[in-house]
């Protein structure tokens, strides 16, 4: 499956801390097209869309991994990697612009995490992680370094209308790495 709309709004965290991906409305089976989702159609959310999606090219699991990279970038820095005045301007930046280093915003982020996120954000699918298991392995290798930066200032608020959850940044990154291994493998 290729989800094609991985974004913070489609990633839910249960009260128990389990990560769930939702909204499979524009999902496709890899190597399969329908009239609604054929090559040339642009589907997805501009802030989280892969370069190939923004160009209407075929998508793959690497496209979803790119989108996950945008989510991790925003989770760590507090902002998406690319912003424009319009959705089209934002989508164009995914094609043309290079993302800033995460350490520009957070000096305490381990180099291994920064490198993993930047690898996810490569413009060409062949330059990204080959599969979710490779990404998951790299993120789990960084678990000790992530836990070392766990401070009160690293708490991330996830708010729903009724319940407010607080998770540390390292816990969220590790949880996302686990969900990555289950969705795209």
Question: Predicted segment positions?
Answer:
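Conserved catalytic-core element of eukaryotic-like protein kinases
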Residues: 2
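Conserved catalytic-loop position in the HRD/HxD motif
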Residues: 5
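Activation segment of protein kinases
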Residues: 15-58
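C-terminal lobe helix-coil module of Hanks-type protein kinase domains
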Residues: 45-146
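Juxtamembrane amphipathic/hinge helix adjacent to a transmembrane helix
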Residues: 145-154
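C-terminal or otherwise distal, non-catalytic regulatory regions appended to signaling enzyme catalytic cores
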Residues: 153-185
């Amino acid at each position: 499956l290729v989800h094609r709309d991985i974004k913070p709004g489609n990633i839910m965290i249960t009260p128990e801390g389990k990560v769930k991906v939702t909204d499979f409305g524009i999902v496709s089976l890899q190597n399969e097209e329908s009239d609604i989702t054929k090559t040339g159609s642009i589907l997805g959310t501009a802030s989280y869309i892969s370069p190939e999606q923004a160009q209407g090219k075929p998508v793959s699991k690497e496209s979803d991994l790119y989108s996950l990279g945008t989510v991790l970038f925003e989770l760590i820095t507090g902002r998406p990697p690319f912003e424009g005045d319009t959705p089209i301007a934002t989508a164009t930046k995914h094609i043309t612009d290079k993302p800033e280093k995460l350490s520009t915003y957070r000096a305490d982020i381990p180099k291994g995490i920064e490198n993993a996120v930047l690898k996810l954000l490569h413009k060409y699918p062949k330059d990204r992680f080959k599969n979710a298991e490779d990404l998951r392995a790299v993120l789990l290798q960084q678990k000790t370094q992530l836990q070392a930066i766990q401070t009160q200032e690293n708490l991330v608020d996830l708010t729903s209308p009724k319940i407010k959850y607080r998770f540390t940044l390292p816990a969220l990154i590790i949880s996302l790495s686990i969900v990555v291994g289950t969705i795209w493998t």
